[in-house]
Amino acid sequence: MATIMDFLLRQGLNVPVGYSSVGSQSTSSSSTSIPMDSSLRNVDYLPEIDITETKDSLIIECELAGVLKEDISIEVAESKLIIKGDKKRYAYRRPNQSWSYDDKNQISQSSKISEQSSGADQWQHSNDPNVDSQSNLNMPSSKQDPNVQQSRVGNVPESKVNRNDTTEPNLPSQPFQSDMNPSSSSSSIEKQQIPNVSHPSFQQWSGQPQPQQQQQQQQQQQQQQQQQQQQQQQPFEQQSQQQSNLNDPMQRQDSKEISQPSELQRSNFGESSVNQPSSSSSSLLGSDNSQSNVDLPSSRSVEPQRPNVSDSDTNQGYSQSVEQRLGNTQQQSSQLPQQQQQQQDQPRSNVNEPSFQQWSSQQDQHRSNVNDPSSQQWSSQPSEQQQKSNISESNVSQPSSTQFVENIPSNLEQLPQQEQQRSNGNEPSSQPWSSQPSEQQRSNINEPPSQQWSSKQDQQRSNVNDPSSQQWSSRPSEQQQQQQKPNIGELNVNQASSDVCSGPSVSETRKQFEENYLNEQQRQPQQQDLSSLHKDEKKPSSSSVSQTAQLFEPNKREEQRKDKPEEKKFDSDIIKSSEPTNVESIENKDWIQQKPQEQQQEPREISSTETSNLQQPMERQINTETPKEQQVSPQQQQPQQQQQPQQQQQPQQQQPQPQQQQQERKYISERTFGHFKRTMDLSKMLYRLNLREEVQTHFVNGLLIIILNKKPFEPSIKIPVN
């Protein structure tokens, strides 16, 4: 005990102490042990320690101004109580005092280091050979804009490009170099030209690994001649991929061509995707945003972008099948410059033309399988690769989609194209116009009429890029049904989200769930025990089903109590929160009458925290029950019957304590020293326990209670400490 007192003293906690002393001897503050027959008189420096010495026990209470951490070793040797604590770990503090110990200092210093380092590079590139060049790249932008520094975990190159373009839009030929430190510009370019394919932080930037991107770009170029719609998508995707991957060797050759439309880059990255890894979907959304509705960046940047992060962008590279990617391995890098120059102006010039709308109608397809040829050709039969990828897509994307039910922006009228690009993906925000689909989508995909579309909406949402589902067949394809069988988690997710979108509202489904749950709860106890029904024959027959269900809970409780003594506290809360009817008083009567007998039959081992937790809520429950029940009780018979069990409660509740506490003697609860914040308002009850040679320690409501008894066990007396 003295060691705790010593380092409390060194903390400067000079709170005066009240204590009752019986005895003459006192020990100096530097001693490491306390003779048991002495009471401490020189404890003025301690924070509120009560030391109570009775005939057979010494009770020490410390009220600690802080948090008591885990490991305090307590030994009893030859009538001496020795408490040892490591001062560095216990960081006690006054309310206005900052943490001042070693581990805390290390934490604060490390956080300062991470703030001073360039943005998120410390975390992103811990294993990266290019750390130096990349941190040099990012230093200026992190100094310019602290917001970018915080939000840019996966985005380092994008925000870098974006900052330069927005601040210097008139320098089209310098999108990348102007942000570099001049000393490191040449070396960093050389390093960046070597694609660091396998590095994980690189994959975090781009949302998908590099070799797949190159091959997917080649696949796109092969399809370029087939469909004019794709011609508009490709330059955006390639630009965003190349800007997000500074390591692409193509990108250095074409930097001038990429940098010409500074509006495109600004719209791609400035508004929409500062906060997320770049993906072709975000760049498509962003460019659409700047060109068709320039005045709506706020709704764009706040709401729609979150699902894209958890959409299959992160999944996509991994879920695409190997045979798709390995089919087209020949390099077509010679086409890149012309292709980009050809098509950079098309999306801007075609904003309001049908081809642009065709592009937007396929946006959901892009979101999950951005560069997948089979999904863009709308083949009538789903490839195996898509069946594979869709399973993972729906798992990833569904949970995030439910967050957006209430966030549908108010300016929907102004956002028809953008919102539908988003909503045709995995979000339930597509519901408002599910009954009347936009002309763009119907005309371009050659769907049947709109009723089939809205009725198949959950099908569309769970399999965004399944070609068979996008042909809107009137019955779900077999591939979908197969897809939902193997993966149970996905099936649950899809069902829940389809309820949100096309079925009843969230509150209705929740009501339905609660009703089902209550019905099950009511069925189970009746099967368990019908015998206790006879106890309720005195009661009026008008009691509801839920009340009769509560009748049987004592039987459940007793089963639980045999295994988990901690459940008592929870049960008392259940009693309070459930309808306060006369049923509860019967419940308590049965429960209390059976309680001492059980304890005699089965000695249990309860840790000291559990006893201190058990006894307080039960006594508090006695007080809170009577007013509630008398207010609610419809008949006058009930209060009279209620008072009888409560009179029985109080004597019977104190009797089982000796039995519980006798079993506690062998166990010092190690869990008592946890992180408990001090709460002054709760009642402090001390139970004198006999532990013979061992010490019982409590940490209850901010009190450290250390009790050591000298004599064999006697029936316990409650010692209230004020």
Curated annotation (Swiss-Prot):
Q: Where is the composition biased (Basic and acidic residues)?
A: 554-576
The UniProt entry, under CDD domains, shows: ACD_sHsps-like
For this UniProt record, the keywords arranged alphabetically read as follows: Stress response
Compositional bias of kind Low complexity: 106-118, 203-244, 272-292, 330-347, 374-389, 428-443, 468-484, 634-662
Which taxonomic lineage is given here? Eukaryota, Amoebozoa, Evosea, Eumycetozoa, Dictyostelia
Q: Where is the sHSP domain?
A: 40-179
Record InterPro entries: A-crystallin/Hsp20_dom, HSP20-like_chaperone, HspG1-11-like
* Region (Disordered) residue spans: 99-666
Q: Which superkingdom heads the taxonomic lineage of this protein's source? A: Eukaryota
Q: Which organism is it from?
A: Dictyostelium discoideum
What name appears for this protein in its UniProt entry? Heat shock protein DDB_G0288861
